[in-house]
């Protein structure tokens, strides 16, 4: 799949991002490389491969579930083009 200017413009609109004109060509190439890589992964024959939940046989220690004060929502919301009460406001894309 090739990422062209038409698709990049659609992605730009859906993501509410502004892509600088001097970065468009580079981004098209990078996205095309990512999509091509994923398409190659899709070609792998994995019918005889058992599903794995981890790549190692060791257990991962759990961290304590402690409540912490975080300003992540405020930080992310101030960079969003449109947000309200900690939520993103996005255009409707499904009819």
UniProtKB/Swiss-Prot annotation:
Gene Ontology biological process terms in this record: glutaminyl-tRNAGln biosynthesis via transamidation; regulation of translational fidelity; translation
PANTHER family (UniProt xref): GLUTAMYL-TRNA(GLN) AMIDOTRANSFERASE SUBUNIT C, MITOCHONDRIAL
Keyword Ligase in annotation: yes
Family the UniProt entry places it in: Belongs to the GatC family.
InterPro entries, per the entry: Asp/Glu-ADT_sf_sub_c, GatC
Glycoprotein in keyword set: no
Gene Ontology molecular function: any one: ATP binding
Catalytic activity as recorded in UniProt: L-glutamyl-tRNA(Gln) + L-glutamine + ATP + H2O = L-glutaminyl-tRNA(Gln) + L-glutamate + ADP + phosphate + H(+); L-aspartyl-tRNA(Asn) + L-glutamine + ATP + H2O = L-asparaginyl-tRNA(Asn) + L-glutamate + ADP + phosphate + 2 H(+)
Keywords annotated in UniProt: ATP-binding, Ligase, Nucleotide-binding, Protein biosynthesis
EC number: 6.3.5.-
Function (record text): Allows the formation of correctly charged Asn-tRNA(Asn) or Gln-tRNA(Gln) through the transamidation of misacylated Asp-tRNA(Asn) or Glu-tRNA(Gln) in organisms which lack either or both of asparaginyl-tRNA or glutaminyl-tRNA synthetases. The reaction takes place in the presence of glutamine and ATP through an activated phospho-Asp-tRNA(Asn) or phospho-Glu-tRNA(Gln).
Domain of life of the organism encoding this protein: Bacteria
Gene3D superfamilies per UniProt: Glu-tRNAGln amidotransferase C subunit, N-terminal domain (1.10.20.60)
Protein name stated in the entry: Aspartyl/glutamyl-tRNA(Asn/Gln) amidotransferase subunit C
Subunit text: Heterotrimer of A, B and C subunits.
Gene from which this protein is expressed: gatC
A Pfam family this chain is assigned to: GatC
């Amino acid at each position: 799949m090739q990422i062209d200017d038409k698709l990049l413009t659609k992605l730009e609109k859906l993501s509410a991002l502004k892509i600088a004109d001097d970065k468009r060509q580079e981004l098209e190439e990078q996205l095309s490389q990512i999509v091509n890589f994923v398409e190659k992964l899709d070609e792998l024959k994995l019918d005889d491969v058992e599903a794995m939940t981890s790549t190692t046989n060791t257990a991962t220690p759990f961290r304590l579930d402690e409540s912490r004060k975080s300003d992540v929502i405020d930080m992310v919301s101030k960079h969003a083009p449109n947000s309200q009460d900690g939520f993103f406001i996005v255009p409707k894309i499904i009819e």
